[in-house]
């Protein structure tokens, strides 16, 4: 029994994925995959939801995605799970945003956005996710597609990364 527990703990500690979490209050929804929170001593942080890419606000379903996130998160206390860096429980990404999973009452909000057909699983950064999480996100996207939920109700929804690329050139 002790050996099994020890092995599980060691497996976790030696895992290539090291995550920490911190509690924060959601104060603003930027779009379907970005929020502002107050953390610690009222420090404002911008959070980019890990593993998803929601439609941009000017895209089809961009407003719906943002509205849904606002409905379920605005004003709520959440846990943010992110990779720790130095003395902080988070790492900043390229645009100086915390990249993390948002958890509300034990539920994975990033995953919920995919299940509701309001975001893609952002596979470009899948290496930043544990394997079981990747599988859950892939499965959720497949099921939403099959059921024509949200953005999947359109014939050929344009992924936000392609939309951004097309609109940068203009």
List PLM regions with ranges.
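Small beta-barrel nucleic-acid-binding modules, primarily SNase/OB-fold domains
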Residues: 2, 6-7, 16-170
């Amino acid at each position: 029994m002790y050996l099994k527990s020890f092995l599980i703990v060691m497996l976790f500690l030696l895992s290539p994925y090291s995550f920490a979490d911190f509690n924060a209050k959601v104060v603003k929804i930027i779009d379907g995959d970005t929020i502002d929170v107050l953390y610690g001593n009222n420090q404002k942080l911008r959070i980019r939801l890990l593993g998803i890419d929601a439609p941009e606000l000017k895209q089809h379903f961009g407003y719906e995605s943002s509205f849904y996130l606002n409905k379920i998160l605005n004003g709520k206390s959440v846990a943010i799970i992110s990779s720790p860096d130095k003395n902080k429980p988070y790492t900043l990404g390229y645009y100086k945003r915390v990249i993390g999973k948002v958890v509300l009452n034990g539920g994975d909000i990033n995953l919920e956005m995919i299940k509701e057909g309001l975001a893609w699983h952002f596979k470009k950064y899948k290496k930043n996710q544990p394997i079981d999480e990747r599988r859950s996100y892939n499965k959720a996207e497949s099921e939403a597609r099959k059921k024509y939920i949200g953005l999947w109700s359109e014939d050929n929804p344009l992924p936000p990364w392609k939309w951004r690329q097309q609109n940068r050139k203009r």
